[in-house]
Amino acid sequence: MKIAIQTRDAELTDDLREHLEQRLAFALSRCQNRIRGVVVGLSDINGSKGGIDKRCHLRIRLNGLSDIAVEETEADFDVAANHAADRAKRTLARRPRYARDIP
């Protein structure tokens, strides 16, 4: 599974990159064979003003199905990424029930 991380007005440290990759690999491991790739977007909405403004946007590209997009905003990128990964995992678990069969 390919994971691409993009930032906007946010600093991507090596620790944060490693945390994101490990967290997503763990959360999405069960559905890994259906995933073409994941694009992670990190942005600091208010810049240096502070507050709950760290956004993590996930776009999960699936084989033969439409993409899944999940977005979380928290005070910290680690927390936002954890919540987004959990939501993506739950969404993927529900997805086969609603998807039509693809030849």
Which residues does each PLM region occupy?
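N-terminal, polar/charged subdomain of small-to-medium soluble alpha/beta proteins
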Residues: M1-P103
